[in-house]
């Protein structure tokens, strides 16, 4: 004779319990929300690279956290309707997570930079300064890029890259790497402001399916020698 089935307990909150929880955790939740808000508000490469990296870490952990929560909802679904939606959300989250990794790996093959795994954008700006390749993420697909030298400090699109440079060190070409292609920007204008400052404007001139040169030797002109089709 089979034993009687034990009913599954239903967990529910009363209004008083919810208010008590908020009172007990209100301070901690407020600090966490404030921290995330500050990171999202001021996390830009042109403001603070450290804050931007923290922002990227938070965004990076959002997808696995979302997948965990959707799987939890599937296991502990309240009814069949919730179960159906939870399964759909889980599949969508996993597919988007896999697509992110595939695109990031393809971009890494093209550039060789760990910025390829940036969850915010798939646009990586690449500039060769005296044999050193700088790679930084940019949010938008710009038609022009501006490189600025201020008393030896190099900025491009407002992002500080390095020091000890002059206008003569600026390359003839700058590239922006994407998942499917590489955009080449040609220097169209250069103006000197004082003895140690000035700026150059680069205009998008060519788009192709290339990767960055594997060697960083030589001048910035080497960036134009796009090879190794992928």
Curated annotation (Swiss-Prot):
The chain crosses the membrane at residues 25-45, 56-76, 85-105. It is a multi-pass membrane protein. It is found in: Virion membrane; Host Golgi apparatus membrane. Pfam families: CoV_M. GO terms for molecular function: structural constituent of virion. CDD domains: HCoV-like_M. Keywords: Glycoprotein, Host Golgi apparatus, Host membrane, Host-virus interaction, Membrane, Transmembrane, Transmembrane helix, Viral envelope protein, Viral immunoevasion, Viral matrix protein, Virion. GO terms for cellular component: host cell Golgi membrane; membrane; viral envelope; virion membrane. Residues 46-55, 106-228 are intravirion. InterPro entries: M_CoV, M_HCoV-like. Its main location: virion. Residues 1-24, 77-84 are virion surface. Belongs to the betacoronaviruses M protein family. Component of the viral envelope that plays a central role in virus morphogenesis and assembly via its interactions with other viral proteins. Homomultimer. Interacts with envelope E protein in the budding compartment of the host cell, which is located between endoplasmic reticulum and the Golgi complex. Forms a complex with HE and S proteins. Interacts with nucleocapsid N protein. This interaction probably participates in RNA packaging into the virus. This is Membrane protein.
């Amino acid at each position: 004779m089979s034993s009687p089935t034990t009913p599954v307990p239903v967990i529910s909150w009363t209004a008083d319990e919810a208010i008590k929880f908020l009172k007990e955790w209100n301070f901690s939740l407020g600090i966490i929300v404030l921290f995330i808000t500050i990171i999202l508000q001021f996390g830009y490469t042109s403001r603070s690279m450290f804050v931007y990296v923290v922002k990227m870490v938070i965004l990076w952990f959002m997808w696995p956290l979302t997948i965990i929560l959707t799987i939890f909802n599937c296991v502990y679904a309240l009814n069949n309707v919730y179960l159906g939606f939870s399964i759909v959300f889980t599949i969508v989250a996993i597919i988007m997570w896999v697509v992110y990794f595939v695109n990031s790996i393809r971009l890494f093959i093209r550039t060789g930079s760990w910025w390829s795994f940036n969850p915010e954008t798939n646009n990586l700006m690449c500039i060769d300064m005296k044999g050193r390749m700088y790679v930084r993420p940019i949010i938008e697909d710009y038609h022009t890029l501006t490189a600025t030298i201020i008393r030896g400090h190099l900025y491009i699109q407002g992002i500080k890259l390095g020091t000890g440079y002059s206008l003569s060190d600026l390359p003839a070409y700058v590239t922006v790497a994407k998942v499917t292609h590489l955009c080449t920007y040609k220097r169209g204008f250069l103006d000197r402001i004082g003895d140690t400052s000035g700026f150059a404007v680069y205009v998008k001139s060519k788009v192709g399916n290339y990767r960055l040169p594997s060697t960083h030797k030589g001048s910035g002109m080497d960036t134009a020698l796009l090879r190794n089709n992928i």
